[in-house]
Amino acid sequence: MKKVEFFMLLLCFIAASSLVSADPPTCPADLGGKCSDSDDWQGDFFPEIPKIKYEGPSSKNPLAYRWYNAEEEILGKKMKDWFRFSVAFWHTFRGTGGDPFGAATKYWPWEDGTNSVSMAKRRMRANFEFLKKLGVDWWCFHDRDIAPDGTTLEESNKNLDEVIELAKELQKGSKIKPLWGTAQLFLHPRYMHGGATSSEVGVYAYAAAQVKKAMEVTHYLGGENYVFWGGREGYQTLLNTDMGRELDHLARFFEAAVAYKKKIGFKGTLLIEPKPQEPTKHQYDWDAATAANFLRKYGLIDEFKLNIECNHATLSGHTCHHELETARINGLLGNIDANTGDAQTGWDTDQFLTDVGEATMVMMSVIKNGGIAPGGFNFDAKLRRESTDVEDLFIAHISGMDTMARGLRNAVKILEEGSLSELVRKRYATWDSELGKQIEEGKADFEYLEKKAKEFGEPKVSSAKQELAEMIFQSAM
């Protein structure tokens, strides 16, 4: 018996010795390893994933770019500058695959099951390694995605400060910084009636304090934009809602944000992200046109631009191209959340955009806009619930970036070839006449137009040539 006890004691001693002399811990995400719980952990999160490089259209490597060549110049601008791609922290590092009907399906090896500040710091390190391997310089965040909520506002701010200091340190020696930051004003029960449109004045004040802090940390990290997405800013029924008062409150909230932006010296763009519904039945920023009207009514049109999300366009009954053009012609196109939805599904599926035709239309708007900076293309998109390998995170972003790159190449081809532009020019050719110019310059009243109508007689109406336009478009694919 004593021999057995001695043997067990010897094994324990050997095990302890090996722990003391072991190499620093790593986090082999691709090998199913476990992470250290230490705040100071510094291992590799993706040791089996190489730095993603451009290999050209003939490549069969899923971990390589086929169409996105960051340094390639197109229309006098590097491809990376056309896009300014960004990774969404919430989907990439907080998405679990859970849905209203099922539990989480993604268990990334670096997660320890807690919502601690220590775990938040680990995720931030993973984020920076992910960005560097993709070759992406921007990322986006909600305040409560990157740091845990506390029991008080002061505790929440302290948690956020700790994680932000790590992010600031990780930024050193790189070009990485936030494309935009925002405050999460929809998850906590206090925001069930909204934040800026809540029926409770105390909630309004709390939301303002949270946005104030989120603006500060975005500015501190060198963020280039700040986003307002009003997931709870709307109503479930008008029977218990004072819509006019709520919209006035929302405007006062935005006015305060503009004032604070100027006070702290934040030079970034303030962005409103339209969405018609979900989680609220009816949101006040339903679509680009609704948001533009709100900004004009309250004298905020020169202080904000719009962050257009393609899936939100689907939910509002529009195409992404429609929303982009609405924003562009109003001088409000500020950023694009590059994702797509499912036309057969009535909710926000947040899929990576892989439709080359849709990407081409998106890029036609961006080219006409002269680019998107200081905004960019944020991949507000998540893996499917059934995609559970770590490499899927990379493959999804590579696919999305390649799709947008193909869209850019196609859009340039269409615009330079000129047939589509010529078709549109011919369709509106009568407006280049003397009468057309008089109307466009506001010099033709109804009496004058009546006189002209009698002179012309029954007007000729030409074909719109939609099928030809579609043929020209498809030929570039």
Curated annotation (Swiss-Prot):
Binding positions for Mn(2+) 1 per the UniProt entry: 273, 309, 337, 380
The organism's place on the tree of life at top rank: Eukaryota
Coiled coil: none
GO BP term, pick one: D-xylose metabolic process
EC number: 5.3.1.5
GO terms under cellular component: endoplasmic reticulum; Golgi apparatus; plant-type vacuole; plastid; secretory vesicle
Binding site for Mn(2+) 2: 309, 312, 348, 350
GO MF terms held by the record: metal ion binding; xylose isomerase activity
Keywords recorded for this protein, A-Z: Carbohydrate metabolism, Isomerase, Magnesium, Manganese, Metal-binding, Xylose metabolism
Membrane spanning stretches: none
Catalytic center residues: 142
Free-text cofactor note: Binds 2 manganese ions per subunit.
Cofactor: Mn(2+)
UniProt catalytic activity: alpha-D-xylose = alpha-D-xylulofuranose
Family named by the database record: Belongs to the xylose isomerase family.
Record protein name field: Xylose isomerase
Organism listed in the record: Arabidopsis thaliana (Mouse-ear cress)
Gene: XYLA
